[in-house]
Amino acid sequence: MRHAWLPYFDAVNAIIFLAPISCFDERLTEDPSVNRLEDTLLLWKAIVGSKLLGKITLIVFLNKCDLLKRKLQSGIMVNKYMISFGSRENEVGSVVKYLKDKFKDILRADASEPRTTYLYATSVTDTKATATTLNIVRDGIIREHLKHAEFV
């Protein structure tokens, strides 16, 4: 069903992809057999693999880092839910690095062509850091537009 919406993005210049990384231990409501983070990765794979979206700038927010931190501090082990996480340290920095690498690996393996991609770890409750990140993203999008218009 998700592939049905892809044609509506043909005139889009950028996609902001929100990936709630704190949901590594949760299941989809509509299908309890599916891990929410794995579902997010499958959706990412569909987006980067789409030829219709091949030239679009991708901006990924690995979001809800504050909730991730709380879960990890409470003793919830990532490798219990994501076997591929292995014996990495069960702390926010390790999880974020692992997931950034995972998103990049999917992009390299499945992208229809090379494209500009930005990855940021965010916590929307940290408004100062979020504002800074959004300003960086805005500046990047403006730079891309200027480059395509051959002003840069």
Task: Label the model's feature ranges.
Residues 1-5, 24-27:
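Switch II (G3) loop of P-loop NTPases
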Residues 14, 18-152:
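Conserved GTP-binding G-domain of TRAFAC-class P-loop NTPases and closely related GTPase folds
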Residues 9-10:
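A short, aliphatic-rich alpha-helical micro-motif
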